[in-house]
UniProtKB/Swiss-Prot annotation:
InterPro entries: FitA-like_RHH, Ribbon_hlx_hlx. Putative antitoxin component of a possible type II toxin-antitoxin (TA) system. The cognate toxin is VapC12. The keyword Phosphoprotein does not apply. Keywords: Toxin-antitoxin system. The gene is vapB12. One of its GO terms (biological process) is regulation of DNA-templated transcription. This is Putative antitoxin VapB12. The keyword Zinc-finger does not apply.
Length: 75
């Protein structure tokens, strides 16, 4: 089952740009926005990314992060 979503108070400039992008892809505004929302929903949530990063094994880089940054900046 699908649902209807309404977005209020969209600035005129933003609406114009979205309509132009939809037209450039030969899509209706509704289809264009639905495709973009689907892309957003496919992106991992920040909490999931952070959990995956936390689960990675720690590596000894032989220097602190600050030292590595300083070294890279001096090159």
């Amino acid at each position: 089952m699908s649902a209807m979503v309404q977005i209020r108070n969209v600035p005129d400039e933003l609406l114009h740009e979205l309509k132009a992008r939809a037209a450039a892809q030969r899509m209706s505004l509704s289809d264009f926005l639905l495709a973009r929302l689907a892309e957003i929903a496919e992106e991992p949530a920040l909490d999931d990314v952070l959990d995956r990063l936390a689960a990675l094994p720690r590596r000894d880089l032989g220097a602190s992060a600050a030292e590595l940054v300083d070294e890279a900046r001096s090159e």
